[in-house]
Swiss-Prot record:
Zinc fingers typed FPG-type, residue spans: 236-270
Catalyzed reactions: Hydrolysis of DNA containing ring-opened 7-methylguanine residues, releasing 2,6-diamino-4-hydroxy-5-(N-methyl)formamidopyrimidine; 2'-deoxyribonucleotide-(2'-deoxyribose 5'-phosphate)-2'-deoxyribonucleotide-DNA = a 3'-end 2'-deoxyribonucleotide-(2,3-dehydro-2,3-deoxyribose 5'-phosphate)-DNA + a 5'-end 5'-phospho-2'-deoxyribonucleoside-DNA + H(+)
Name of this protein: Formamidopyrimidine-DNA glycosylase
Pfam families, alphabetized: Fapy_DNA_glyco, H2TH, zf-FPG_IleRS
Species per Swiss-Prot/TrEMBL record: Shewanella woodyi (strain ATCC 51908 / MS32)
Subunit structure: Monomer.
Cofactor(s) this protein requires: Zn(2+)
C-alpha cells in the first residue's frame, strides 16, 4: 500500500507536468473506485492547475474552481504519459492537459479514489480531522506526549492513528519503533518523554530517507515514471519476521496488532 513517502514521491514526480497547465479533458473508464467518481469531477476541465500538494496520503490538485482529491488506495499509481501511450487494463482515469501530456490513474484493486471539492479543501470531511504532518514542526515530542497521555492502546496503533499524526503507515511504524528501541505493544501513555524524543526523530528521519530513496517498493508501487522505489532494501524489521535482527542477531518476532503484521526484536525493543 502506498504510504506517505510514496504519495510524496508521486507528487514530486507529477507536479512539473501539471502546474500552470490547462486541463483539456477528463476520461473516466471505470468510475467504480472506493467511492464512485462523481460527475462533478468534470468541472476541472477548462481549469488551470495552480498547485499540486499532499495532505496525509491524499494528493490534491488545485484549481480556481476547486480541488481534485486523489487517493492511491492499496495499489494505485499515477503516471505522466503521452496521447500515444496504450491504455492498459487497470488504467481507469486520464486527465488530459494542453501540453499533450496525460496524467493516468491506474488501480488494479480499485480501492483508490478520485473526488472533487469546491470549498476550501481543509473543510473536506476526509481531511478536516487529520493530525499534523510528521515532517513538520507541529509533530514534536511535546505534542506527542500530550496526545498519548492516559492512552492504554499500543504505541504502534497510536503511531498509525491519523487523528494523532498522519501518514505513518504500517511499514514505517514498524521501522521507527525498531530504530527507537520501543516495543510495539507498549502502552502509549507509558512511553516517557525521553523515549518520545527519540521516536519523533526516528519517524522524521525514516520518512525523509524513504522519500529521498523514491519510496518503498512492495508489490505494486512505482513512481510517476513507472520506476520502483528502493527503500525496501533498507528495511530492518518489516516483512522480516523469523529472520535475524540486524542489530543483535536475535530472531525477529511477528504478531498481529490491529490486524496488521507487526515485526519486532524482543531484545532490542523494550517496554
Amino acid at each position: 500500500m502506498p504510504e506517505l513517502p510514496e504519495v510524496e514521491v508521486t507528487r514530486q514526480g507529477v507536479s512539473p507536468y501539471l502546474i500552470d497547465q490547462e486541463v483539456t479533458g477528463l476520461t473516466v473508464r471505470n468510475a467504480s473506485l472506493r467511492w464512485p467518481v462523481p460527475d462533478l469531477a468534470q468541472q476541472i476541465v477548462g481549469q488551470t492547475i495552480r498547485s499540486v500538494h499532499r495532505r496525509a496520503k491524499y494528493l490534491l490538485i488545485d484549481t480556481d474552481a476547486g480541488t481534485t482529491i486523489v487517493h492511491l488506495g492499496m495499489s494505485g499509481s499515477l503516471r505522466v504519459v503521452t496521447e500515444l501511450t496504450p491504455v492498459e487494463k487497470h488504467d481507469h482515469i486520464d486527465l488530459s492537459l494542453a501540453s499533450g501530456k496525460i496524467l493516468r490513474f491506474n488501480d488494479p484493486r480499485r480501492f483508490g479514489a478520485w473526488l472533487w471539492y469546491e470549498l476550501p479543501i481543509d473543510a473536506h470531511p476526509l481531511l478536516s480531522k487529520l493530525g499534523p504532518e510528521p515532517l513538520t514542526d507541529a509533530f514534536n515530542p511535546s505534542y506527542l506526549f500530550e496526545s498519548l497521555k492516559g492512552k492504554k492502546k499500543a504505541i504502534k496503533l497510536c503511531l498509525m492513528d491519523n487523528h494523532i499524526v498522519v501518514g505513518v503507515g504500517n511499514i514505517y511504524a514498524n521501522e521507527a519503533l525498531f530504530a527507537a528501541g520501543i516495543h510495539p505493544q507498549m502502552e502509549a501513555g507509558k512511553v516517557d518523554q525521553e523515549r518520545l524524543i527519540i521516536l519523533v526523530s526516528e519517524v522524521k528521519q525514516i520518512l525523509a530517507n524513504a522519500i529521498k530513496q523514491g519510496g518503498t517498493t512492495l508489490k505494486d508501487f512505482t513512481n510517476a515514471e513507472g520506476k520502483p522505489g528502493y527503500f525496501a532494501q533498507k528495511l530492518h524489521v518489516y516483512g522480516r519476521g523469523g529472520e535475524s535482527c540486524t542489530q543483535c542477531g536475535n530472531l525477529l518476532s511477528e504478531i498481529k496488532l490491529g490486524q496488521r503484521a507487526t515485526v519486532f526484536c524482543g531484545l532490542c525493543q523494550t517496554r
